[in-house]
Structure formats: structure tokens, C-alpha cells
Design a protein with these regions (language model features):
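N-terminal pre-P-loop "Q-motif" helix
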Residues: 8-12, 239-242, 272
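Walker B catalytic acidic pair
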Residues: 262-264
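Phosphate-coordinating catalytic segments in nucleotide- and nucleic-acid-processing enzymes
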Residues: 19, 45-260, 332-397
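Pre-Walker A (Motif I) flank of P-loop NTPase domains
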Residues: 21-23, 256, 291
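Active-site/pore-lining binding-face segments in mid-to-C-terminal subdomains
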Residues: 43-45, 50, 267-356
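Short hydrophobic/aromatic beta-strand immediately N-terminal to the Walker A/P-loop
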Residues: 24-27, 260, 294
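Pre-Walker A-like glycine/lysine-rich segment at the N-terminus of P-loop NTPase domains
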Residues: 1-43, 47
Length: 397
């Protein structure tokens, strides 16, 4: 079964219905609900949410899962949410209550399925936290409870605020243990960067030509023969290095099967955006553990990057005999199949609601050219008008 989600009257979202694929891109201006959709999706696929719906009727406790993502206040009296999972579960929120059903299982079979799934996840989570499986969850300190619960989830959120991590890379443990009042998503991000640093004392980012070196005193960045403190490196480096380390760590530990990335373009020059997106595509193609990726962005440039990968994959499928020609232009690890990507454009309607539409051309499987050209067309039009005015001035002199 394909994943799809219906959202009505939740935060800035009035009424949308979307079918989700392996890679899902949401593009639009600020405040139209891109992050709301990504965060809601992360919550709705949470095994722990499914468990609570089945075994706990306390709706306030269930909604605490949404508080982690800062969207708990988005629920309204007429909010309606419906989420269909790949494994045939249907999670609904209607008239102030969550419900869960299955296309084949009755309630008893659902409980058995979720308990078994949760049990495997719990054991893996205990091991990841360095705890004995015999430990009683209720007796664990709050910090260890938080680690266990976060490791049990299937989705990991990479927030836009991630660039703040670089400024405090050598104070992460203190920030986490001191319970500094930061958003839970950011604290979790900090926690996983701390784990990643312990795992990778040195970490290379080939497409940036640098190496990260973890240290108890001051983390370092090595670029060629030049070494600088990580906290004094560029904002782009501070944003991208922890993110890549965390993703690699999570994949190696088999923690999450789904990732949501906010604004990959943050603090990055276009060529670095290109390298980052292609790095992410290669991870998706190489790692069997990644089942789903959501990206929110403001950048049409990122769509152009993706379109090149889709086109390469399309030509490869149509004419395998042209493999050598295609791979000379773009390596196979950067190719995408149009069947595994969906791109949605979000915008504000006249009445203030959010409009969400697919911008994949159904006939070609590629991102619609008129959408990609829209921004450059506006810029070109303005430039041409100014250029004509400039030429007129020159002629009058």
C-alpha cells in the first residue's frame, strides 16, 4: 500500500491530500506549511504514537509526541488527519481523538503486531543507550529515558536551527545535561552529534575537501594543511558537517528509516548545495535502511539539481546501451527514478489557506519546466526592463 496523508485545519494547513513516495520535496515561501507537513509526517509514522493510541486513551498524553516537534498547539476543534502507512495501518485524528485501524488485522492482532515491533525497537534502543535489556524503563533517569524513546522512533528530524550546533560543539554534553530550555528537536540533534563525535574521531567530507577532528578541548577542521577551530569555521561548514555525521551515525546504528531535512540550502553556496543534494541521493541509493526522505526548501535551484538526476535515471531506463555516455555526465549513484520521487509546491491562496500541488509532470516524470523557469523569468523580465532603461540613458548622453 502507498503512503498518503490527508490534513484538514491543522496549523496553517486548511485542506490537502498528498501521496508520499520514497523522496518527497516540499517547496514554497515562508509560512505556507512545509515544515508543518514534515513534522506531522514524522509524528504520524512514530511506532510509539501507534502504541499509545492502542493502549492509552489519554489524548493529552498522546499529543505530547507532537510537542517534541512544536506542533502540539496546531490542533483545532475541526482538525482532521488521516495517515495510511506502507504496512496497511490507518491512523486518524477526528473530533479530538486519535484512532488506529488496519486493513486486515482486528484490534487484538494490531496490538500483538505493535508490541512485537515495539519490543524489537526497545531492545535495539536499550543497546544503543548502553543499557541492559533487564533495566526497568520506569526507574531510568530522565536523560536515559529520553535517549531510549528517541532511539525507538522511526523518523529523525534535521531542523533548520542545526547551524547553531557548531558554536557549541565542545559544550554539547553540558547543554544536554543542564536541561537548557531549547526546542526538544534541537536538543535531540545536539545529543546525536555528541554520539557521532564519539563514534567518529575523524570524519571526512570529500566534496568540501575537509576533515573534521573531534577533541575534548576544541573540535578542529582540517582543510589541506590548514587547521582551524570548528567554532570559527564558516557557517556552511558548521551546518553541514554535524548533519552528515549524524546521518551516517544513525544509518550505521540502524536507528531510523526515515529522515526529514529542513532547508538543505542554509548557509551554502550553490555549488555546495549541488554537492550536498548529490551526496544525499547517493546515500539513498546505497543505504537499504533509508525508506523515506522529506526535504523542505525555498530553493528552485535544488529542484534543478534533482531534475538532472531524474533525467539521467530516465535516459538510463529508456536506453541502457547509453550507460557509458550517461555515466560520463553523471555517475550512477546520483541517478533517480521518477517513480520514487514526488515534489509538491505550496503557496498561499487568496483566502489565506495553503495550496499544495504536485509539480511532477505526469507525462515525463520530471519536475515541470514552467515551475523551474518561474523565478528566473521574473528576474530576467526585471533585468531586461532595467537594461532597456540603461541603454536609453546611454543613448541620451
Amino acid at each position: 500500500m502507498k503512503e498518503f496523508m490527508i490534513i484538514k485545519n491543522f496549523g496553517p494547513i486548511e485542506n490537502i491530500e498528498i501521496e508520499l513516495k520514497k523522496i518527497n520535496i516540499f517547496i514554497g515561501e515562508q509560512g505556507v506549511g512545509k515544515s508543518t507537513i514534515a513534522k506531522l509526517y514524522s509524528c504520524m509514522q512514530d511506532i510509539f504514537l501507534h502504541f499509545l493510541i492502542l493502549f492509552d486513551s489519554n489524548q493529552k498524553k498522546i499529543k505530547m509526541i507532537f510537542k517534541r516537534y512544536g506542533i502540539h498547539s496546531y490542533f483545532k476543534d475541526d482538525t482532521y488527519i488521516e495517515f495510511h502507512t506502507i504496512s496497511d495501518f490507518i491512523v486518524k485524528y477526528e473530533k479530538g481523538k486519535f484512532k488506529i485501524s488496519h486493513l486486515e488485522y482486528d484490534e487484538e492482532k494490531m496490538k500483538i503486531f505493535i508490541i512485537n515491533l515495539l519490543g524489537d525497537s526497545l531492545e535495539h534502543s536499550f543497546n544503543g543507550a548502553g543499557l541492559s535489556r533487564d533495566s526497568n524503563f520506569k526507574d531510568l533517569p530522565d536523560k536515559e529515558k529520553e535517549i531510549v524513546v528517541s532511539n525507538m522512533r522511526t523518523s529523525f528530524y534535521l531542523p533548520a536551527e542545526r547551524s547553531l550546533v557548531g558554536c557549541a560543539s565542545n559544550s554539547l554534553y553540558s547543554i544536554i545535561t543542564a536541561k537548557v530550555p531549547l526546542p526538544k528537536m534541537l536538543l535531540e540533534y545536539l545529543s546525536f552529534f555528541e554520539k557521532a563525535k564519539n563514534e567518529y574521531q575523524e570524519y571526512e567530507v570529500p566534496f568540501l575537501g575537509l576533515k573534521f577532528k573531534a577533541s575534548k578541548d576544541d573540535d578542529k577542521i582540517l582543510i589541506g594543511d590548514k587547521e582551524i577551530e570548528f567554532k570559527y569555521s564558516s557557517s556552511g561548514i558548521q551546518s553541514i558537517v554535524p548533519m552528515l555525521m549524524i546521518v551516517d551515525y544513525c544509518l550505521n546504528q540502524d536507528y531510523f528509516s526515515s529522515f526529514a531535512l529542513e532547508e538543505p540550502e542554509i548557509n551554502l553556496f550553490p555549488t555546495n548545495q549541488l554537492e550536498l543534494i548529490r551526496f544525499i541521493i547517493s546515500k539513498i541509493n546505497q543505504e537499504k535502511g533509508i525508506e523515506n526522505l522529506i526535504i523542505t526548501t525555498h530553493s528552485p535551484y535544488i529542484l534543478s539539481i534533482l531534475n538532472v538526476s531524474i533525467l539521467a535515471g530516465k535516459i538510463m531506463e529508456m536506453k541502457p546501451e547509453l550507460t557509458d555516455d550517461i555515466t560520463t555526465i553523471l555517475k550512477p549513484e546520483f541517478h533517480l527514478s521518477s517513480s520514487e520521487i514526488e515534489v509538491f509546491s505550496l503557496g498561499k491562496q487568496i483566502n489565506g489557506g495553503t495550496e499544495c500541488e504536485s509539480i511532477i509532470d505526469s507525462s515525463t516524470g520530471m519536475i515541470k519546466g514552467n515551475y523551474l523557469d518561474a523565478v528566473s523569468s521574473i528576474i530576467s523580465t526585471d533585468f531586461n526592463k532595467l537594461n532597456r532603461l540603461y541603454i536609453k540613458i546611454l543613448r541620451e548622453q
